Amino acid sequence: MPREIKDIKDFLIKARRKDAKSVKIKKNPENVKFKVRCSRFLYTLVITDKEKAEKLKQSLPPGLQVKEVK
């Protein structure tokens, strides 16, 4: 089941949960989508600022599998 998250801090909390398996990063010309797969939901965060997206990518937990999709 998909869920959309509007807040970056809320997304980071979801990404640090122990049931979070992986993060997919989808880059489009106008935005960047971060999708974290947890046991029940797929949480999506849409960011239009490229600099914020790079900072968020750096602050993801190190044990999480990160996959970039174009």
UniProtKB/Swiss-Prot annotation:
GO terms for molecular function: structural constituent of ribosome. GO terms for cellular component: cytosolic large ribosomal subunit. Keywords: Ribonucleoprotein, Ribosomal protein. Gene3D superfamilies: 3.30.720.90. It holds the Pfam family Ribosomal_L38e. One of its GO terms (biological process) is translation. InterPro entries: Ribosomal_eL38 (IPR002675), Ribosomal_eL38_sf (IPR038464). Belongs to the eukaryotic ribosomal protein eL38 family. This is Large ribosomal subunit protein eL38. It comes from Bombyx mori (Silk moth). The gene is RpL38.
